[in-house]
Amino acid sequence: MSKNKSNKCSGIVVALKANYLFVEINAQKLNFFTSDISLNKSRLLCTRRSKLDYQGLFIDVGDEVLLESIDWVNKTAVVSDLCPRKSFLKRPAVANVTLIAICVSVEQPLLDAEQASRFLITAEGSNIKPLLVLTKIDLITKENLNFYRDRFKLWGYDCLGVSLKNKQGIELIIDQFRQTKLSVLAGPSGVGKTSLINYLIPTLSLPISSVSKKLKRGIHTTRHVELFSLGN
């Protein structure tokens, strides 16, 4: 065997592009959350054994997989098997999620409690711990913020209030992400998910769309699911 190749090892699928998978070795030891463009990290470009298709095994972002025929020079490998999943979120399709941060804005667009409840139900139904994040809290009074917190507390959920304008609550949400293995940001369009990701990882520079003045809601900009390391 070539010294540039090794036997089997495991890794986590961080992105899917056409018929290829990007797998990060030992990624299970890092912290991740999802977004929609490449960070150009050192990853292995992988194909998959046809037997997985015959067995009806579908691989999604977040899946832990076994690799073989690894070429470290060219950074390629073959996915030979899929490890058991601990959880699965259907939309976006992400496996092994341990925390879903559900972002809802208190203004621009106005908080929609019914919409928030649908995201919470999805998280609970997927056996994933939900974290409710209230964004743009600089646009409302402290009294209104406490009203929303009390309302969601009656539902059984504590809230984190976040404002990128005055940096309020940012460290708290970072601590939540670092305490778990794989986190997902979810929520309606226009609530500030992309802005939050750009703040946490400035090198990404993800495109941001403004809230429609006519429709009073955000414009959907997500293209695909990808995992990124939050770092230290």
Where are the regions a protein language model picked out?
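Canonical P-loop GTPase G-domain recognition
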Residues: 139-191
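Conserved RecA-like P-loop NTPase ATPase core
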Residues: 13, 62, 177, 196, ...
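N-terminal accessory targeting/assembly segments
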Residues: 1-113
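Switch I (effector-binding) loop of TRAFAC-class P-loop GTPase G-domains
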Residues: 51, 86, 203-232
